[in-house]
A protein has these predicted regions:
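Bacterial N-terminal signal peptides
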Residues: 8-17
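Boundary at the C-terminal end of the N-terminal hydrophobic targeting segment
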Residues: 19-25
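Bacterial N-terminal signal peptides that target proteins for export
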Residues: 1-9
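Extended soluble regions of mature proteins
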Residues: 25-254
Length: 254
């Protein structure tokens, strides 16, 4: 891949760039004019050592518009991690529920905790953005993914254990209340997040959200294959121009 300075091609890339903030989302659905724009938050894959796998993330998202109508979109995408903690993730467009066609890949992500680099690659423009990746790989999942009960009014409930895709998971249901007036509501509304977390893999295999703000979403990790993926899966594609957006190293004054 050819590496160039970030500013040198910034303006030429602006028309096709996907902001890094959207890297956590497959896509976004706008509400009716005058409403808010909900955001879909997917699962987070940590750089866990010695826990290699390949899997598919399936998402179904229902968003209610200001006029009371709702729309449902979906997609699926490939994720993988090797024993060194390197992570590969696809991002795909969302398509209306019922559409049988495979959606287009919008972004490819390559996270390397050893080199402390992360690439966001865009197939439509054959361009990759290179950023610092400050997260270091670790050997033990330090959390089951749950938030702290009582913080900001959050109520957390232990749902016990369940085997999903052959892996033991810990279930948690979290409920927060949306204050009156937040979205035109005259009384408090519950937002519920239920997830089943695999300590072996270090992330949620199931994530269900019921939220008046962002809509209802169902995320499932399926087709989990334990073991080392093909090493080529963690290499950014050949022939892409790389925009180096890393921060310059700090220099000490003498």
């Amino acid at each position: 891949m050819k590496t160039v300075g970030f500013l040198g091609v910034l303006f030429g890339f602006a028309a096709l760039s996907i902001p890094c903030a959207s890297a956590q989302n497959s896509d976004q659905v706008r509400r009716a004019e005058g409403g808010t724009r909900p955001t879909l938050i997917s699962i987070s894959i940590p750089p866990l050592l010695n826990a290699p796998f390949t899997a598919t993330v399936n998402t179904v998202w229902t968003v209610r518009s200001g006029d009371g109508t709702s729309s449902t979109v979906k997609n699926h995408r490939t994720i993988a991690r090797d024993s060194a903690g390197r992570i590969f993730q696809e991002r795909r467009e969302l398509t209306p529920d019922g559409d049988k066609q495979e959606t287009a890949i919008t972004q490819l992500e390559y996270s390397d905790p050893t080199m402390h680099q992360k690439y966001f690659c865009h197939p439509d423009g054959h361009v990759c953005e290179l950023y610092d990746y400050s997260v270091s790989a670790f050997t033990v999942d330090p959390t089951n993914g749950a938030s702290t009960s009582g913080v900001n009014g959050l109520k957390s409930e232990d749902l016990g254990h369940e085997v999903i895709e052959g892996l033991d998971t810990i279930g948690t249901r979290e409920t927060t209340m949306i204050a009156p007036g937040t979205i035109g509501n005259d009384h408090a509304l519950p937002a519920v997040r239920e997830f089943w977390h695999s300590m072996q893999l270090g992330f949620n295999l199931v994530l269900n959200r019921t939220d008046p703000l962002s809509g209802n979403s169902i995320i499932r990790v399926t087709e989990i294959r334990l073991g080392e993926p093909d090493s080529h899966l963690f290499e950014p594609p050949e022939g892409f121009t790389v925009m180096d957006a890393r921060k310059p190293a700090a220099t000490s004054e003498k």
